[in-house]
């Protein structure tokens, strides 16, 4: 499979680059069972948050950086094939510049282009099975320190600590942890960094307001939690290339022509992709 490089501009104007594995062709032979990772259900996120508010728990959210590469691929053999990634063009130059002694001797020329073939040893972004491999690692590590997983949701785990329940729910590498004692979250944060912080600090958000999975959870009022997606919706509008004004408002999209195809000109590829992205974010 080939490597791809994506450059995106963040909201603060900085440019973020990520080299990923082009896993799209692997859909032909990877089954859903071998590539799909479970994620916490919306019902679980909401119900556990209500419990947090009712019990007056301390909440903490975390993001594990570079989570996927901390999961090893299965070793070749026993039905497992080696995974080879093809790197071409400017990406080869970048790698050679970073570590000439490592990559330089293995660069070859194909059709006038520099090519580098590497064996993939760990899960990387773009692999269909990357999130599942990370899930197995994280679940195993949580179970080793005494967490028991909810039989109805494989991404919610609980542990009895100081006589009270410690709850962790997660969506891939985004976590929310809660316990009545802030000290428990302090210790859990230290454990996360000790376990996964070698590729970047596992940062924590503490306090009464948390931005988690595109939602804002506000525990400021005792015994209650308020959930909204105002910031998420605002970012959708800001990122949309067509700028909307105060008069661009409809009471409902369910007009008489909602399901009529019409004969308008189709969107070009760029705008079609943008349209699909915005619709997907709104679902």
Say what each PLM segment does.
Residues 1-283:
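Long, low-complexity, charge-biased intrinsically disordered regions
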């Amino acid at each position: 499979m080939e490597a791809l490089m994506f450059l995106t501009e963040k909201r603060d104007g900085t440019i973020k680059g990520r080299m990923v594995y082009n896993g799209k062709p692997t859909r032909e032979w990877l089954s859903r069972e071998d590539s799909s990772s479970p994620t916490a259900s919306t019902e679980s996120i909401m119900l556990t948050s209500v419990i947090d508010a009712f019990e007056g728990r301390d909440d903490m959210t975390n993001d594990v950086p570079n989570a996927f590469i901390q999961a090893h691929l299965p070793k070749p053999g026993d039905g497992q094939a080696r995974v080879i990634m093809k790197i071409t063009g400017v990406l080869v130059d970048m790698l050679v510049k970073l570590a000439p002694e490592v990559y330089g001797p293995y660069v070859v020329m194909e059709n006038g282009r520099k090519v580098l073939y590497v064996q993939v040893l760990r899960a990387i972004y773009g692999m269909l099975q990357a999130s599942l491999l990370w899930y197995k690692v994280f679940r195993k590590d949580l179970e080793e320190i005494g967490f028991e997983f909810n039989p109805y949701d494989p991404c919610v785990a609980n542990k009895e600590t100081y006589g009270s329940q410690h709850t962790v729910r997660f969506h891939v590498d985004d976590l929310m942890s809660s316990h009545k004692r802030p000290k428990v979250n302090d210790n859990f944060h230290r454990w996360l960094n000790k376990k996964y912080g070698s590729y970047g600090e596992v940062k924590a958000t503490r306090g009464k307001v948390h931005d988690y999975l595109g939602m804002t959870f506000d525990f400021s009022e005792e015994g209650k939690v308020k959930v909204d997606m105002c910031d998420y919706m605002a970012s959708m509008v800001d990122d949309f290339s067509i700028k909307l004004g105060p008069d661009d408002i409809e009471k409902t999209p369910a007009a008489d022509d909602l399901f009529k195809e019409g004969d308008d000109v189709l969107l070009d590829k760029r705008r079609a992709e943008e349209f699909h992205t915005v619709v997907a974010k709104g679902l």
